[in-house]
């Protein structure tokens, strides 16, 4: 891993972002599509009123949906867009099984609905580094979507929707008398859902008067007079790649003296081919500035190439680089 001194990263807070004006972001109405899969999904119904019995039964237990009972769903996030991750899906809710034609004990309403709930999706890398959190609110019916109301980490300020929970195997309904430490042993449902997200910001390659901030190993800017070759190791400078380890607070500059590798998966495609990302991390002294070292893939055509940077499954605006 090599961290280079760059004239393209301005140290003063906020100055870095002003270099992005020359770029065109993806269309505002083009959502980022993310599919999340989870396992061991269990619904715990708050039907245990003797406090001495809560979370004591080794299980498995069962429960029945009843009006006004508090419920809590939990599952283990296992993939995002097919990529292995870790994480927790949790969802507290108040059970209100609304019905247009209710049976005794069921609340009446104009539509059949399960009532409102909130979902929290905390996503980590496969080795446990924090990527980000998505928060949504919604109901199983009648609307087709849950509304994404915010996020943190790589998903800071995110809005959007996600569709219905699709269960490949049914969620297990349990009682709050059951010991939740045994959830994985007892098993549960397998689910997937697809998010359609509108990011507050995207990963972007910094724009300079001479073109995108992509340089050769000697620090020289890639240009028509100095094109890139297949297999060459390049460095690009960017914003919006999300949290790092160690963590740096929002709005604070990356300190000197340490490497700050990005937590989220980072991908660079040239004409649709993935490059080998050698290092992606915060750039010392910059606010939201990052350096990415990568190897150009084989088989790129001579002339120009379209380079697209993606972080946390969020694509940035493509930029054009000269190739040979």
Question: PLM ranges: what are they?
Answer:
Residues 1-5:
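Positively charged n-region of N-terminal signal peptides that target proteins for export
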Residues 7-21:
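Bacterial N-terminal signal peptides
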Residues 9-13, 148, 221, 293:
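Preference for short coil/turn "hinge" residues that link or interrupt alpha-helices
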Residues 9-10, 145, 218, 311:
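Homeobox/homeodomain signature
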């Amino acid at each position: 891993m090599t961290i280079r001194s760059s004239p393209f990263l301005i140290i003063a807070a906020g100055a870095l972002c002003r270099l992005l004006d020359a770029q065109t972001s993806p269309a505002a109405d083009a959502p980022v599509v993310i599919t999340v899969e989870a396992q061991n999904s269990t619904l715990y119904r708050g039907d245990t009123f003797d406090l001495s019995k809560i979370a004591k039964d080794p299980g498995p237990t069962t429960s029945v949906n009843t009006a006004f009972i508090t419920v809590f769903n939990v599952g283990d996030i296992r993939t995002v867009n097919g990529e292995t991750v870790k994480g927790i899906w949790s969802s507290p809710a108040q059970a209100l099984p609304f019905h247009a034609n209710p049976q005794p004990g069921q609340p009446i309403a104009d539509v059949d609905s399960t009532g409102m709930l909130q979902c929290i999706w905390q996503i980590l890398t496969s080795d446990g580094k924090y990527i980000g959190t998505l928060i949504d609110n919604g109901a199983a019916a009648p609307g087709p979507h849950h509304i994404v109301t915010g996020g943190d980490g790589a998903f800071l300020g995110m809005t959007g929707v996600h569709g219905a929970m699709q269960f490949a195997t049914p969620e297990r309904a349990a009682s709050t008398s059951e010991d939740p430490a045994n959830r994985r042993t007892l098993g549960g449902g397998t689910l997937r859902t697809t998010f359609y997200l509108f990011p507050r910001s995207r990963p972007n390659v910094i724009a300079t008067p001479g073109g995108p901030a992509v340089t050769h190993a000697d620090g020289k800017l890639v240009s028509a007079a100095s094109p890139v070759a297949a297999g060459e190791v390049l460095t690009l400078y960017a914003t919006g790649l999300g949290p790092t380890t160690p963590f740096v607070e929002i709005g604070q500059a990356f300190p000197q003296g340490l490497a700050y590798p990005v937590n989220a998966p980072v991908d660079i495609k040239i004409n649709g081919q993935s490059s080998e990302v050698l290092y992606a991390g915060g750039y010392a002294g910059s606010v939201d500035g990052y350096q990415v070292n990568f190897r150009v893939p084989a088989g790129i055509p001579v002339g120009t190439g379209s380079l697209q940077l993606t972080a946390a499954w969020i694509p940035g605006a493509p930029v054009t680089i000269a190739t040979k």
